[in-house]
């Protein structure tokens, strides 16, 4: 029970290990878990390598992902750590947002240096908006030549800079997950140093409550004598009664004032992120608003139709399509609470996309949706999900 009482007092941070398969992500995850357990036994649970390595299958929006969740604490923070062992698992996890990361540890084997998958993971981390990367130069016990280690470190820093991260300033810590697991004091200290770097350099995440208010509209009602009420679950921010808001998406942006907030038939003074509530909107008729729009703090988000995205297309086994699709494919894009038809353009050189592939694409929606980079969506056909993606760049 000791665990529960710490949970509220410390910042909670989501991190993960990313990088090339066989560079030791899972071993390092197990080593972090063990080193922190040995250092702070009252704060941490004992986990062995096998329990992390046998990553359980999860289904996120119908997509099968093997992923391990490990919790641990330093003196400063409580961490939830995700480790997706396979390359395909990592890509699915990043694109579907199954596990959001506030920061990630890029694991690069000192014996190999950055490989093709290392590059792909760093690019994807930037596209889906992982705010911070730092580097664990793993298997450093196997490289005797200091100059070679310096060279690999330089290569990794250049890779980070080329993908829009701060390669000059990012901490690069030389570690050995395996030796730390075996209890070798020099390498146990290296893992402690790595976690000290994570504590210091990964910024505290901005909590949902501190972001600008946004509530997707799920339903619209008329209350006789009072006006129009929209219901939904507040995604982020807080909203006080008598605040001005904008209704964004599908139609031209409308401004209104929230004259009442209700939750479970009780009147509230404000709505908070995570709560299901009804908002009474001044001067709007039932036909002025619809499901799929969002109620937002004025000026915080804008409607768009054209964007670039990174998408994972479900395999046949996951209940996806049985055959490929080409440019000009017109499925539905499900954003928050509604489907909007869109036309897909595949990148140059990509003839078609097979079930089970991940791809970049450009999409033109027939109606505008309140959108920002990093927003997730599902691709649907006749009500069933055939893909999952994230907006990587807004075009118009």
From Swiss-Prot:
E.C. number(s) listed in UniProt: 3.6.5.3
Keyword entries, A-Z: Cytoplasm, Elongation factor, GTP-binding, Hydrolase, Magnesium, Metal-binding, Nucleotide-binding, Protein biosynthesis
Chain's gene name: tuf
Domain tr-type G as annotated: residue spans: 10-206
Residue ranges, annotated region (G3): 83-86
Residue numbers binding Mg(2+): 26
Protein name: Elongation factor Tu
Stored CDD domains: EF_Tu, EFTU_II, EFTU_III
């Amino acid at each position: 029970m000791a665990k529960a009482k710490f949970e509220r007092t410390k910042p909670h941070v989501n991190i993960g290990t990313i990088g090339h398969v066989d560079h030791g992500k899972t071993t390092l995850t197990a080593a972090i878990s063990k080193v922190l357990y040995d250092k702070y036994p009252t704060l941490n649970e004992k986990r062995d390598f096998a329990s992390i390595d046998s990553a359980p299958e999860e289904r996120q929006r119908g997509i099968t992902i093997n992923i391990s969740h490990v919790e641990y604490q330093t003196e400063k923070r409580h961490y939830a750590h995700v480790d997706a062992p396979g390359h395909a698992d990592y890509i699915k996890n990043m694109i579907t947002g199954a596990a959001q990361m506030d920061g990630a540890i890029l694991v690069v084997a000192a014996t190999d240096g950055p490989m093709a998958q290392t590059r792909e993971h760093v690019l994807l981390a930037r596209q889906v908006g992982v705010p911070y990367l730092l580097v664990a130069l793993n298997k450093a016990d196997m490289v005797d030549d200091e100059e070679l280690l310096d060279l690999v470190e330089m290569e990794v820093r250049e890779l980070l800079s080329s993908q829009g991260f701060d390669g000059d300033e990012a901490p690069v810590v030389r570690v050995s997950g395996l030796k730390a697991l075996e209890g070798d004091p020099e390498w146990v200290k290296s893992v402690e140093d790595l976690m000290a770097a994570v504590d210091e350099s990964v910024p505290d995440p901005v909590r949902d409550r501190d972001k600008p208010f946004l509530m997707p509209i799920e339903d619209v009602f008329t209350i006789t004598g009072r006006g129009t009420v929209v219901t939904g679950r507040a995604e982020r921010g807080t909203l006080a009664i008598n605040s001005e808001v904008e209704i964004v998406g599908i139609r031209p942006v409308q401004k209104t004032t929230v004259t009442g907030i209700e939750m479970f038939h009780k009147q509230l003074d404000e709505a908070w992120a995570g709560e299901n509530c009804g908002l009474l909107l001044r001067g709007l008729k039932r036909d002025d608003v619809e499901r799929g729009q969002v109620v937002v703090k004025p000026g915080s988000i804008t409607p768009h139709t054209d964007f670039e995205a990174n998408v994972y297309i479900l395999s046949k086994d996951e209940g996806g399509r049985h055959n490929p699709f080409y440019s000009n494919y017109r499925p539905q894009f499900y954003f928050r609470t509604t489907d909007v038809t869109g036309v897909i353009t595949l990148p140059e050189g990509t003839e078609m996309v097979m079930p089970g592939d991940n791809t970049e694409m450009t999409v033109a929606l027939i109606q505008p949706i309140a959108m920002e980079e990093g927003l997730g969506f599902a691709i649907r056909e006749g009500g069933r999900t055939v893909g999952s993606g994230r907006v990587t760049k807004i075009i118009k």
